[in-house]
Every structure is written in C-alpha cells, then in structure tokens.
C-alpha cells in the first residue's frame, strides 16, 4: 500500500512542477489531454466493447486508458495490482466470488466468462480503486452507458 501511495504522490507532484529539465521518464497528463483521449477511445472499439490505449510503459509499471460500453470479462492477475482512476461515465466493479470459465493466459494472468457472487461497488468519475493481486474482478456497464478509466498496473511485492 505504501508503494502505491508513493507512486500516486509522485504522479500528483509531477503535475505541480513541469519544467524543461524534467528527469527521463517523467510524464504529465493534463485533464484536457485525458478528455481528448476519452473522446477518441470510443472511435476504436474492439469486439469486446472496449477500447484501450497505453499512455506510458515504464517496464515494471504502466498507465493505460480504457473505455468500456458493456460488461468486461472477469480477470485476475496473480502478481499485478490494478489501480483504477475513473475519468468519466459510470459502472460497477464486481470483485471476488467464483470465476466461471477460468482459463490461464500467460504469466499468472487469468480470464473468465463471468463472476458468480462477490462484492459490487458502484463507480463514477473521480473514484479511485485499488484492486489487490489475486482478486477476481470485472467492470460492469449498464446498457447505454460507458465508463472510462486510467489504469495503473504495478507489480505486487
């Protein structure tokens, strides 16, 4: 948890001080830029009703932006923590329970067809969620709605 707070603090601190001599690897996404990404993502929908873009990949962690207009397949990451920062829209995070149709992909990554049981947490713009490694989770979106979020994936240690 401390590492997550340090990463989030670093990201927020970076937003305060943007200078020409910023260190290698520094990144700042202004709210106006994220709104532009939010507007573009729905134009590039995949068959699973989602669109995603990698904002930055630093090797051991990465930032992605995702748009969904339908329920996502459940997933689980054995060694990755997901931090979700909702940008727009609304949805529900379903986590825990039993993953039905669970199959391994690679490196401790699991996908399923649905989750039975578990907890449901309504999400909206401005919400931030920490999903621990090893927890089944899925994003649910009501018909006619969408959810867009920035996803920070960091290794669990």
Predicted regions: what they are:
Residues 75, 82-85, 120-121, 128-129:
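His/acidic/aromatic-lined binding-pocket segments of jelly-roll/cupin-type domains
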Residues 78-98, 105-114:
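Short, conserved beta-strand element in jelly-roll/cupin
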Residues 98-133:
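Short acidic-glycine-tyrosine-enriched beta hairpin
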């Amino acid at each position: 948890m401390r590492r997550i707070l340090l990463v989030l603090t670093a990201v927020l601190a970076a937003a305060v001080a943007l200078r020409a001599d910023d260190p290698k690897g520094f990144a700042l996404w202004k709210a106006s830029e994220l709104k532009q990404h939010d507007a573009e993502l729905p134009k590039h929908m995949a068959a699973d009703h989602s669109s995603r873009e990698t904002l930055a990949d630093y090797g051991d962690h990465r930032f992605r932006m995702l748009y969904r207009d339908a329920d996502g397949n459940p997933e689980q990451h054995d060694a990755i923590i997901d931090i979700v920062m909702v940008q727009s829209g609304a949805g529900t995070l379903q986590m825990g329970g039993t993953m039905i149709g669970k199959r391994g992909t690679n490196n401790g990554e699991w996908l399923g067809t649905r989750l039975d049981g578990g907890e449901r947490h309504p999400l909206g713009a401005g919400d931030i969620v920490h999903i621990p490694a090893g927890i089944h989770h899925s994003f649910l979106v009501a018909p006619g709605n969408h959810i867009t979020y920035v996803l920070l994936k960091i290794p669990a240690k």
